[in-house]
Structure formats: C-alpha cells, structure tokens
C-alpha cells in the first residue's frame, strides 16, 4: 500500500465521485452555518423547492453581527434582518440553531469544538474563511462561498480540486511569554501570505505536539492567512482528552471505538509531501504586526522596517503604502508604538485559555489612561466559565469592558469598531485596511501582548513579565 499523508487519507475517504481532469465530489460530514453567508443559500433552496438533505449534519449560530452589550436591541437593520432570516430558515428547514438566547451561542469556530461537533477525520465546511480552525482536531476543514453553502445544504457534497500537501515542521521549544499566536505570525512572516496557496498544511514538530487543543486551534485558524486552503494537526491523546464527554462527541464504548479509529489518522512513514518547510520555535519571539497583512510583522524587540530594505520594487511600494496607512515611521521601536484600543477576542484567541493568559498579565493592574479595552469571550460557555473562575472580575477590576460573545471588533460589520487613525492591539487574525472600521489601524498580537498593551498603553515585551517554565 502506498504511504499517505493524513490529508490524503481524509480526502480519499470522502470522495463520492472522481473523474480525471475534473474536481472531486466530496462528502461533507459537518456543515456549520451563520447569519451572514446563509440567507441567499436558504432562499435558493426555497425557490427550487429543495430541502436540507442532512439537517442532522448541519448546525447554525449567530455570531458575526450580534451585539455584545445589549442583546435585546439590534439597531443595525441589515444585522437584524440577517439574524431574523437565519432563525426563520432554521425553523423552516429543521436546522439546529444556537440563537442569541441559547447558552450554546458563540463564534461558530469556537462552539464547534467546545460542543464536540468537530471531530478527527471529518470534512467540515462553513461560509467563513477561518473554518480552517477545526483542522486542529485532524479534520479537513475549509471555508466556502454562498453558492457552495447552498450546494452543501441541498446535497451534503461539494466539488473540490484535490489540494497539494505541505508539512510545516516547528521544532525546538518556546520561551515563556511566546504563544501559539506568535508561532503562526512568525511562520507567515517568514514564508509570506501566499506560500500556502493551493496547499493544505499539516503542522508537525515538538512545539506543535506540546500545545493544548486551544493553542492548536489558533495555529490552524490562521492557515488561511498563509494562503492555504486549510491547515490541520494529526490527532493525539491531547485531542481525545479534549473531546471526551463533549455534548455531541461519542459516549462510552462508542467513544473508545472512535478513538481507535482516530489513532489511524496520521501521516504514514514514507509518505511524501509536495513541499516541506521548517521553523525553529526557539527563535520565535512575541510578535507584533506593523503593516496591513499578517506577514508584515516584527519581533517585539525589533523595529518598523525601512521600505528600502526590501528586494523588489513591488515589496518596497507595498511596505511604503502600509506604513503610510498605519501612520508609522521606519526605525520606530515596536515598544514605542502606542495603542488607543485593545481587543481580546475573535475565533483566533477568545477561548478560556486565551482569557486566562491575558488575565495573568492584567491581575492587580489598571488599564492605561486613554486606552479602551474590550474582552469578548468566544462563546457564552466561555463567558460563563470565565465568570465562575473569577477571570471576568479580574478584567473588570482592571478597567476592561466585559462583553457577551460574538465576533465583535474582529471585523467592522457590527457596533464594535475602531475609529479612523487610531491603533488597536488585537488578538484577531486580519489587519487589512479598514478591517476593524474605516481607517482603523490594527496590530495583531497574542492575548498576553494585547493585555500588556492595555496596561502600559504601548507594546511591551511580555517575556519580561513571565516567570513560567519553558514548555
């Protein structure tokens, strides 16, 4: 038998129909739905007189547009209409929905794992680019467009071109204060925003294996920012322990049988990737983006680069335009960049471990004058747990705003935005022009780095604040 990568194993297991020179027809195990990319898809079914083929393999929630302060009032008409439409569509087509009043509501890429819907070996799709998050469980998960959402609703299948495979091997150990967010920013910073184009990435190596499931989700979440179709990590005992007793995960003997099957989901010895890249985790520092792509970043002890340092005219122009938008000058120390806003949240970094990491920095301190700081849990379950652990009170005592769950300030399509010309330390995944609001200047960082920026009013090296043992 020819050795296979885990990517090839999952793909081949789900091919319904294959024809040379054409896309494969894949079976989809889990379809996650939210209010923004689904209305037209459901309307398409309605117009054609079709039903949702597998409502039992479909799960919906409201996240992108939801208010995070007063949920009883949705002032934006577009947002209100989208949420009303999702509620109506789920009721009509029999799709389970975690609405604003549900204790299971949250960001779709947070609740999928915490409810146990996300499982190793599954094909998972959602009308959202950061569906790659679920790859942390050894699933093949990727975002799709609205027309594809309709196709999956109607057929539980999807036409897809077979991707190339890439191993991203992260060796060594991380220093205290260096997080999964720093690892993925360092990878993108080293190899670029398009090095993964046409590939599914498998993250391997000692650094990855030592990570918790929530750290692995951060890594896979930003695979798309490297241009990849998806990213995944082979499941192991960490994965199985996380899933045990989750609401929708198998129970009892069925769980043990599932684990035995999941253990086969690994890349065979001798399997050949289309490409292999390496990065030494020991060399990674806390990282801050200074530009308008996730690749435009520097270690915290670095400086804003000079456009003239770049090799090509295209690169020089891109850096020049980015610095102009960000209002930064070459040579500025990263620690001298002041922030007016801090956002701890998003599908990248809003889980309980992220909030614990940030609270550790914040405890006993106060938010700096002139800084507005928000903490937005990724789900109502995360919110409840943080409140029970006293983490929420730590943030409140420090002067942070403590919110309900939702996508919030990650994207400028709800009430939580950053004013033009102001800088935000954000634990989200994208720093494009206008991402957090028209003219907003976004710096991507880890939860610890964001928390420290809130306290000091500028970026600081969190390694000086940590006294933990090296992972």
Curated annotation (Swiss-Prot):
Coiled coil regions, renumbered to chain: none
One BP term from GO: L-leucine biosynthetic process
Regions that span the bilayer: none
Catalytic activity entry: (2R,3S)-3-isopropylmalate = (2S)-2-isopropylmalate
Pathway in which this enzyme or protein is active: Amino-acid biosynthesis; L-leucine biosynthesis; L-leucine from 3-methyl-2-oxobutanoate: step 2/4
Gene Ontology MF annotations: 3-isopropylmalate dehydratase activity; 4 iron, 4 sulfur cluster binding; metal ion binding
Entries under CDD domains matching the protein: IPMI
Cofactor needs: [4Fe-4S] cluster
Family classification: Belongs to the aconitase/IPM isomerase family. LeuC type 1 subfamily.
Oligomeric form and interacting partners: Heterodimer of LeuC and LeuD.
Main function: Catalyzes the isomerization between 2-isopropylmalate and 3-isopropylmalate, via the formation of 2-isopropylmaleate.
Protein name: 3-isopropylmalate dehydratase large subunit
Species in which this protein is naturally found: Anoxybacillus flavithermus (strain DSM 21510 / WK1)
Gene name per UniProt: leuC
